[in-house]
Amino acid sequence: MKKIGIFFGSDTGNTEKAAELIHKKIGSNISMLYDISNVSKKDFESFDHLILGVPTWYYGEIQCDWDDFLPILKKINFLHKTVALFGCGDQEDYAEYFCDALGLIYQVLKKNNAKIVGKWPTIEYNFESYKALLNKDYFVGLVLDEARQPEKTE
């Protein structure tokens, strides 16, 4: 049985690319990659360790496949599960909503007893939104801006 489930949603391919890079770094011998559009509650519950890739769309909206899965996600008890987050956004064109969807998923996980690990420094990012912040110095997970800072993705 694989130990880590990597779940992502992606419309443009940026979050998928990041998920594939993470999967490759961790290794396919201990991790499994899932597109959120093709998963069930059982898929989530079969892992004790999860990495979730959540892009933000337009005006702070959650990506459509994550939005479809959200009612199921809200019913999962994440007690005894460790979760790390990463998200893609556009800090130039959508600075007022930068990675907001990551913050929305973070709140659901926190409410449902997840042990959330990882954070990412806010330095070198230009944004106005605070939904994805753990505190003033850190985001709730890794944030990526493939359009403005593609060199940071790898």
UniProtKB/Swiss-Prot annotation:
It comes from the Bacteria. The keyword Electron transport applies. Residues 4-154 form the Flavodoxin-like domain. GO terms for molecular function: electron transfer activity; FMN binding. Its cofactor is FMN. Belongs to the flavodoxin family. PANTHER family: FLAVODOXIN 1, FLAVODOXIN 2. This is Flavodoxin.
